[in-house]
């Protein structure tokens, strides 16, 4: 379980209200597929993922990335119950999709990178600390079924 202070929760929620879900989600998932190309095996039904341009313009990548960030929105609404919030997704990713749980950490870190890029100076060190804790908590919750 990740412990977030009131200040960290505020840092997360104050930025979250300004996040462009579709844009940031698509960018994050696209970057995951480009930077860590072995992750594309989970998305072979998405069509052309042969190069960066194809990935970043692929409508299925963009839509699924948005779906991922919507799930992060659920996490933000339930910061004190991440395992419960992600129980069904953990089961899906473990039992049916067989996703290596390390990929959750990779995607979480890429989400932080995207937020830092989009928010610039507004994404302070304190905000990064809070977001890193959140993505670690989400990755842990998604990996819960694996344990």
Curated annotation (Swiss-Prot):
In-chain residues carrying the UniProt-annotated modification Phosphothreonine: 13
Q: In which tissues is it expressed?
A: Red blood cells.
Every copy of the Globin domain together lies at 3-147
Q: Give any single GO term for biological process.
A: hydrogen peroxide catabolic process
The record's family statement is:
Belongs to the globin family.
Record's subunit section: Heterotetramer of two alpha chains and two beta chains.
Instruction: State the protein's name.
Output: Hemoglobin subunit beta
The lineage, from the top, is:
Eukaryota, Metazoa, Chordata, Craniata, Vertebrata
């Amino acid at each position: 379980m990740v412990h977030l202070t009131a200040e960290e929760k505020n840092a997360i929620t104050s930025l979250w209200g300004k996040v462009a879900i579709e844009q940031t989600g698509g960018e994050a998932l696209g970057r995951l597929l480009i930077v860590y190309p072995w992750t594309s095996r989970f998305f072979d039904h998405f069509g052309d993922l042969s190069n960066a341009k194809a990935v970043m313009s692929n409508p299925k990548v963009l839509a699924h990335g948005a779906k991922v960030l919507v799930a992060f929105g659920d996490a933000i609404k339930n910061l004190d119950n991440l395992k419960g919030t992600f129980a069904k997704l953990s089961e899906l990713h473990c039992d049916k999709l067989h996703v290596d749980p390390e990929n959750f950490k990779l995607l979480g870190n890429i989400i932080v990178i995207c937020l830092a890029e989009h928010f610039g100076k507004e994404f302070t060190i304190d905000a990064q600390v809070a977001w890193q804790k959140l993505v670690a908590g989400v990755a842990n919750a998604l990996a819960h079924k694996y344990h």
